[in-house]
Amino acid sequence: MMNRREALAALASTAALPLLHGCGRESTAPAATTTSPAHADAVKLLDEIGENYLRFAPESATSLGVDTGDRAALRSQLADRSAEGQQKIAAQVRQDLERAKAFDTAGLDHATRTSVDVVRSAYQLAADGFALPYGDITVGSWRNTPYVVIQNVGAYLDVPRYLDSDHPIEAAADAEAYLARLQSYARQLDGELGRIQAARGKGLVPPAFLIDKALSQMRQSAKNTRSGGSLVESIERRTKAKSIAGDWGARARAIAAKEIAPALDRQIAELELQRKSATDDAGMWARPNGDDFYRWALKASTTTDMTPDDVHAMGQEELKQLHAQMDTILKSVGYASGSVGERMTALARDKRYQFSEGDKGRAEILAFIDEKVKWIRAQLPRAFNTQVNPNMEVKRLPPEEEPGAPTAYGGAGSIDGKIPGRYWINLRTTELHSRYSLADLTFHESIPGHILQGEYTRTAPLIRQLLAFNAYSEGWALYAQQLADELGAYADDPVGKVGYLQAIAFRACRLVVDTGIHAKRWTREQGVRFFVDVNGSNPMEVASEVDRYCSWPGQACGYKVGHSEINRQRERARAALGQRYDVKAFNDTLVLGGNVPLDVLANNVDEYIRAAKG
């Protein structure tokens, strides 16, 4: 049951803007009380921008559960990944940005003005990105990359998992839509092909070690696709479960073999060609216009004007503070000799904190996660006044995706609740996880991290549910780890506490390594060694991590920048309110205000302070 504090009434009205037609989850938020012409005009503007967004991102409509009614045709479509398609998106972004910038927000309530400000910020960042000479630019999301197809980017990774996990099959029409999307998938692959060929013509070639990893994955994907693979298995299994008669498997197999596999082969051939001229230079400094791309990517990730030098120095300072805390705890549990990194490496070899190998260990990991999720759910009333109950599930990443994937990731489900929030865990080897680090990872990806935070957006305007800012999303997830600690997750577990601190220090390392690679000409090996030597991180994990920084420049910097800013705002609110400060009310402010850039987050905290003072 929702029980909002009166002090948050102004911020809670973020949830009062009406959902777009077709957003099915019932809201328990109070009805809107603002009915001025300016408010109505703002709602109309936000609705229209949201509809424009979905026209170019039909997958999002399905994932949110709003591909019904007037939007039903979107269920049969995939986004256009060709150069022409990207140009159309860029043109729409520029048009909608001008409308948002021209809108007079002076007469709006705080929540409605915030929504317009969020659109302005997200669309300005995207417009600036589209002005760059290359790259895969997102609108209000976290995955911006110079490389359209690489080890962790591309339709060959996104679409098979998406079709199996998010595309519903409840009736024959859904199965037909699935087949239509299979055909669109082949077109997506060729659209991407044209873009990576054009990028090569501009001198943009990914690092050789990324191409090698991508080619390994793509060859396996093409091999599986020629015989049908998961694309066929998914529709066969689900139509059978729903007793939907038809030759679905045979039709899917024909599309896979005749259209998708050849398109994959064409991408493979292009990357093989690029591999011949590729070097091991890891950073954007070695690419044409790379410094410009990195400056933009860093701004998009952090929503600040911090320079690479600023970010690098911040990471080094944060590491000193975190390692001082770790040093004290490590000494208390018998690890007194050597640097913090050396002691954490020794701790990782301690068999008491390891999971078993193979399937036995995988089962242990899933049981461990289940235990921690149950515990944290029970603690939520101690952290929030406004309660939600996320529908979530834990799933193993598809094995073919695991080599190029991080240890885990998570996100909220659909508006109507039919698609649960998912916590995807990489189980290619149990050595990726330890008993002192997995709880913290779980709190980050699921509850009270990404999955819980996403649940609070479900009554916001649709465009607000589509737009996200990396510094907020990941800053919140790190803050969620901190909340779990403050709620007692490690009260009787000092080794778990040091694992939590190591995870936060890991994000501080990212500030140093990401900027080191892209602005200070570090090699891939330097990045890996920094994590291992300084923080005692798992070499197997950080090799993939550093590869990720090479393909997603700047993205890794949003985590700690966002987390530190949230804590700065928390201390500001505490100082301003004194005895009136309530951490649960502050936490409500963060989640009810929605996903915002950091300057807007500060405005939301201003509003909370004003309301709490009365």
Regions found by a protein language model. Name each.
Residues 6-25:
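N-terminal export signals
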Residues 24-614:
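N-terminal maturation segment of proteins
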